[in-house]
């Protein structure tokens, strides 16, 4: 079984979001599972520099100009690169300029990505062609459409990492991207009078996956579907929509081997976690005290992530004796709110604006509770890291959060399945009730330790996801 992942970023070569983490880990897990998985990426500067052994496979003149297809390896995974300097050789973000304006030629930059993905199934590399083209998010959404236009030389899977980003472009660009105008149709890639790369992926793929079972259900509902609910409900009825939970890359996220921690530990040596807490309290300017629960946030500061709820609930958390350590950036109003809280509650609230991968590991290793109060969350990786590190996740019941965290209810504690704290409603009162439950459990150290050990024993490895995808690919054949 030969599978080509078509996408725009891959950790650690280039990362702007969770998609990169998936592509950085899933293909390697699939190779270990017996699938010949390769990755197709635009040759953005950081990616091009990282694939040092790239060799020319093919040269083509396309609707988007001349391209060179390269092939090399990274971390044992075969990587195809679309070398088109006029489209991809730009500093900074792969999607927008330094003023945060989307590049005006994004329609060509990402149509080309989909086109090359489909051409691979028609022999662009004469020595390797995929049985399945697996496209990810709107950037690769045209790959299934180009395959459909070519009579489907390979099966296609389209994975939705976040339905909110739809890849919308003016209709006249149909003249530029070498797809039949008949595809510009409500039964096709047309959406609200424009081309939607996302809808192209959803409509033309043989199968759609979302990054968690709950998110796969949620995106059939109007409040989560951004206008796509009709199509997604139809795909659900046809059995062509399912959820496959993302995994954790255990080579990077494991407290037993994490060199970024002050003290490494396992579920059997959890007492060693205390040194990480002490170091984190010092680093964040918090009072050094192992008796108080340390809550943490590692997140983009947006209302989608529910960080306004944390700000609103913060006085209640602090009144009960807790501390907060926050690492993140985003909405200026939220940034200012958290910085003001740090000034108002010195020793209780520590805030670092920005994102530092290394420091996020130190927070995960040192905190007692990781807050993930998202309004919606397709999968979420932060809570999975929390489970792995015995840093109990406190989450809202939505998307992948609902699939991965079991509340510390009396029933779940008795059944031995409790792994964190879950609240239902997207308001500060509901969040505060969950925080109070965390304090109650904290007052029972042996029970807290029991739940930590439960959480750390859960298996969210990429091997589980790789097996699910392999079964899906074989069903499509």
Swiss-Prot record:
This protein's UniProt keywords: Glycogen biosynthesis, Glycosyltransferase, Transferase
Role noted for this protein: Synthesizes alpha-1,4-glucan chains using ADP-glucose.
Catalysed reactions listed for this entry: [(1->4)-alpha-D-glucosyl](n) + ADP-alpha-D-glucose = [(1->4)-alpha-D-glucosyl](n+1) + ADP + H(+)
An example Gene Ontology molecular-function term: alpha-1,4-glucan glucosyltransferase (ADP-glucose donor) activity
CDD domains (UniProt xref): GT5_Glycogen_synthase_DULL1-like
Annotated PANTHER family: ALPHA AMYLASE DOMAIN-CONTAINING PROTEIN, GRANULE-BOUND STARCH SYNTHASE 1, CHLOROPLASTIC/AMYLOPLASTIC
Species per Swiss-Prot/TrEMBL record: Shigella dysenteriae serotype 1 (strain Sd197)
Pathway(s) where this gene product acts: Glycan biosynthesis; glycogen biosynthesis
EC number: 2.4.1.21
UniProt name for this protein: Glycogen synthase
Chain positions recorded as ADP-alpha-D-glucose binding sites: 15
Domain of life: Bacteria
GO biological process: glycogen biosynthetic process
InterPro entries named in the record: Glyco_trans_1 (IPR001296), GS/SS (IPR011835), Starch_synth_cat_dom (IPR013534)
Lineage, uppermost ranks: Bacteria, Pseudomonadati, Pseudomonadota, Gammaproteobacteria, Enterobacterales
């Amino acid at each position: 079984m030969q599978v080509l992942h078509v996408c725009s970023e891959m950790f650690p070569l280039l990362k702007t979001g969770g998609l990169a983490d998936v592509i950085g880990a899933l293909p390697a897990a699939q190779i270990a599972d017996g699938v010949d998985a390769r990755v197709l990426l635009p040759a953005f500067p950081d990616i091009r520099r990282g694939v040092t052994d790239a060799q020319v496979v093919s040269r083509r003149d396309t609707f988007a100009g001349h391209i060179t297809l390269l092939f090399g390896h990274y971390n044992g995974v075969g990587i195809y690169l679309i070398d088109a300097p006029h489209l991809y050789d730009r500093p900074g973000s792969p999607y927008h300029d330094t003023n945060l304006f989307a590049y005006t030629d994004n329609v060509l930059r990402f149509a080309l990505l989909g086109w090359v993905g489909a051409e691979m199934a028609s022999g662009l590399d004469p020595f390797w062609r995929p049985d399945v083209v697996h496209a990810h998010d709107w950037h690769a959404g045209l790959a299934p459409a180009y395959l459909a236009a070519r009579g489907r030389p390979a099966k296609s899977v389209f994975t939705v990492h976040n339905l909110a980003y739809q890849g919308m472009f003016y209709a006249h660009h149909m003249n530029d991207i070498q797809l039949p105008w008949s595809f510009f149709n409500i039964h096709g890639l047309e959406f609200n009078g424009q081309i939607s790369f996302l809808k192209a992926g959803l409509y033309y793929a043989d199968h759609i996956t979302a990054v968690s079972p709950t998110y796969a259900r949620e995106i059939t509902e109007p409040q989560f579907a951004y206008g796509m609910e009709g199509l997604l409900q139809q795909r659900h009825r046809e059995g062509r929509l399912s959820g496959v939970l993302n995994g954790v890359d255990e080579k990077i996220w494991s407290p037993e081997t994490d060199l970024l921690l002050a003290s490494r530990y396992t579920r059997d040596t959890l007492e060693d976690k205390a040194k990480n807490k002490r170091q984190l309290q010092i680093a964040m300017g918090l009072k050094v005290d192992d008796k108080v629960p340390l809550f943490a946030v590692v997140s983009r500061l947006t209302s989608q992530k529910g960080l306004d709820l944390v700000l609103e609930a913060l006085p209640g958390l602090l009144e009960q004796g807790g501390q907060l350590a926050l690492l993140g950036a985003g909405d200026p109003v939220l940034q200012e709110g958290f910085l003001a809280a740090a000034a108002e509650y010195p020793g209780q609230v520590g805030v670092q604006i920005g994102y530092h991968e290394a420091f996020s590991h130190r927070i995960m290793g040192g905190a007692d509770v990781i807050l993930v109060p998202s309004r919606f969350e397709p999968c979420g990786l932060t809570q999975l890291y929390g489970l792995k590190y015995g840093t109990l996740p406190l989450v809202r019941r939505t998307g992948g959060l609902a699939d991965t965290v079991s509340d510390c209810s009396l029933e779940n504690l008795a059944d031995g399945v409790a792994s964190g704290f879950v609240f239902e409603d997207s308001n500060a009162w509901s969040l505060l009730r969950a925080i109070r439950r965390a304090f109650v459990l904290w007052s029972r150290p042996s029970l807290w330790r029991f739940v930590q050990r439960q959480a750390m024993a859960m298996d969210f490895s990429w091997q589980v996801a790789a097996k699910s995808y392999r079964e899906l690919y074989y069903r499509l054949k």
